[in-house]
Amino acid sequence: ENIALAFSGKYDKSHAEHYLSKHQATLASRLSHWRDVQLARKALHMAGDPDLVLDLPCGAGRFWPMLAEQPNRVIIGSDNSSNMIATAMQSQPAHVVSRVRPLQTSAFDINLPDQSVDSIFCMRLIHHVGDPAHRAKMLREFHRVTRDTVIISLWVDGNYKAWRRQKLEAKRAARRKETGYQNRFVLPAGQVESEFEQAGFSVVGSL
């Protein structure tokens, strides 16, 4: 089964460039990005500072400078969108890009052999995947490709930021008069942990 998220076809060149700029557009977005980087750095340390990391989806490469801080780390910069990868390769610093191996592939069908990376670094993706069967397929694919860890960001219930996100998504749905389509999901923490375990993972920690 080929799985494509509803928004995945929108990233032409202009959308990819907009995605790059939006994380630096305002003070709030810059602070949010700074916080994301701090948390990601801590998560990598918890994962043993892996040497070979698959950044999927890499987007416009906003985490590449942080991933490249470890001198011997190899980064596979992967995204479903070739425009995203091209934007990342053109916009990130040359000394960082030289450390990156680009790979266009889907998170649901990763074009890599079994146990081929030390860690999969997955930021800002799973909250777009509303179908539990699709999440299960993605997590099973992650389990196949990594030989050690997965670092994954998601929105779970039970905290203020998740509550704000739920309120925002409710407003968006009302404004668009949507009849079932959602692009972002806040998930119950217990459900997420169960899905991880069913895919073969054990939760080492959370931030």
Where are these regions (language model features)?
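Conserved class I S-adenosyl-L-methionine
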Residues: 1-47, 149-173
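Class I SAM-dependent methyltransferase SAM/SAH-binding core
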Residues: 54, 60-108
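Short conserved loop adjoining the S-adenosyl-L-methionine
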Residues: 109-114
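A conserved beta-strand element that flanks and buttresses the S-adenosyl-L-methionine
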Residues: 121
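A short glycine-rich, Lys/Arg-flanked "PGG" loop and its adjoining helix->strand segment in the class I
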Residues: 136-148
